[in-house]
Regions:
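Hydrophobic ligand-binding cavity/cleft-lining segments
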Residues: 1-38
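Short, intrinsically disordered, mixed-charge
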Residues: 19-29, 64, 116, 124, ...
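Juxtamembrane/interface motifs at transmembrane-helix termini
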Residues: 36-40, 89, 114-116
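Ser/Thr-rich, low-complexity intrinsically disordered terminal regions
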Residues: 44-45
Length: 131
């Protein structure tokens, strides 16, 4: 299993950062890696890449303005994502960890670098909304 973690200090107030990250229906507007996201229920949503490739997310824990966790799965991988949000004055520290298991052995050597790239882009997209 590959594990990747990223931490960053976002120049925005905790409630605003939390609200942006959890505004799933508008992911297509601010996430550069997605074409859209579809909310299926209050515990399930699907993200679609620019090429239309779906990944399903199932909420496992939500502690408002503190912690958000979900399981994720597509044809290539299964995993778990944990997001921790901490107020630091007028800024917000984010601490995101992904644990992913590749379903196809050919993909296993590339999972860690792919996760790192995805996390870096996600944080960059969040930052763009607060710079």
């Amino acid at each position: 299993m590959a594990i990747s973690n990223i931490k960053a200090l976002i120049p925005g107030e905790l409630h605003k950062v939390w609200d942006l990250v959890l505004d799933i229906e508008n992911y297509g507007a601010w996430r550069s890696d997605l074409s859209k996201a579809e909310v299926i229920s209050d515990k399930k949503f699907i993200e679609y890449t620019k090429d239309g490739y779906p990944t399903t997310f199932t909420l496992t824990l939500a502690e408002p303005y503190r912690r958000w966790e979900f399981d994720m799965e597509n044809n290539n991988m299964t995993g778990h994502w944990t997001g921790i949000f901490t107020a630091k004055g007028d800024e917000t520290e984010i601490d995101f960890t992904e644990q992913v298991e590749a379903k196809k052995w050919l993909l296993k050597p590339f999972v860690k670098s792919y996760l790192r790239k995805q996390q870096t882009q996600f944080v960059a997209d969040i930052m763009k909304n607060f710079s």
